[in-house]
């Protein structure tokens, strides 16, 4: 009889324990996935600026030890920019302008980045006042954001699927209006990248560009790239 009661109590404890998956469990699981050696994702980014709406096709490649390659393709004019970070620095390659730029920058760690998983996870972890809920089988975080160059952006809603993959992120103003929306279409946590994939020459060759270097005396002497990481200082410009 005692054994029967013991097993009944054990079953109740186990059943009670099930379903108590909370935000800390989710954060831990996301951290394990994102901290792996690499990932690749694709998605669509919509940016609202006053009466203008810009849509970008986004592709992000990440390899451990601070290697990032981000492609932003403007859907309206088919112009692409590639942000590259490796051991040599931060670069922006702009094929439409036949130029590449090298910057002194802490990118992507100096502010929020809606299309980088590490950045979004850091926003979640660093916000002690974050809100968390479960809705329609998905998990939803609401956190503060850090966009020093755009004070209109104050918070974000992060939707994560039941499979623990990022689904959609809305960056909101103080009235709760979405000014940036990132829809994730594909996330691969076990990608394979070709050799030298994160080297500048490889990026320039893939964009069919020449490797001609031009020294720049001041920012005014250069044509600014369409996408400029926050907190950057131009140090070099190359004709591509």
Can you say where each PLM-predicted feature lies in the sequence?
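An acidic-aromatic
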Residues: 61-115, 177-181
């Amino acid at each position: 009889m005692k054994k029967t009661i013991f097993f009944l109590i054990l079953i109740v404890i186990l059943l009670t324990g099930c379903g108590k998956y909370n935000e800390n469990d989710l954060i831990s699981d996301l951290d394990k996935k994102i901290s792996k050696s690499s990932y690749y994702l694709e998605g669509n980014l919509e940016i609202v600026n006053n009466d203008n709406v810009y849509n970008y096709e986004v592709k992000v490649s990440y390899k451990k030890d601070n290697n990032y390659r981000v492609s932003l393709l403007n859907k309206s004019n088919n112009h692409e920019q590639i942000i590259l970070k490796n051991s040599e620095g931060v670069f922006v390659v702009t094929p439409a302008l036949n130029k590449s730029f090298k910057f002194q920058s802490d990118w992507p760690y100096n502010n929020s980045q809606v299309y980088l998983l590490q950045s979004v996870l850091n926003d979640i972890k660093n916000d002690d006042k974050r809100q968390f809920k479960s809705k329609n089988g998905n998990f939803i975080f609401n956190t503060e954001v850090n966009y020093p160059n755009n004070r209109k952006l104050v918070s974000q809603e992060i939707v994560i699927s039941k499979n623990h993959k990022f689904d959609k992120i809305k960056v909101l103003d103080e009235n709760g209006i979405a000014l940036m929306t990132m829809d994730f279409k594909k996330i691969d946590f076990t990608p394979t990248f070709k050799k030298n994939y994160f080297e500048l020459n490889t990026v320039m060759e893939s964009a069919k560009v020449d490797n001609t270097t031009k020294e720049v005396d001041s920012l005014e002497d250069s044509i600014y790239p369409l996408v400029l990481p926050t907190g950057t200082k131009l140090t070099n410009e190359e004709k591509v």
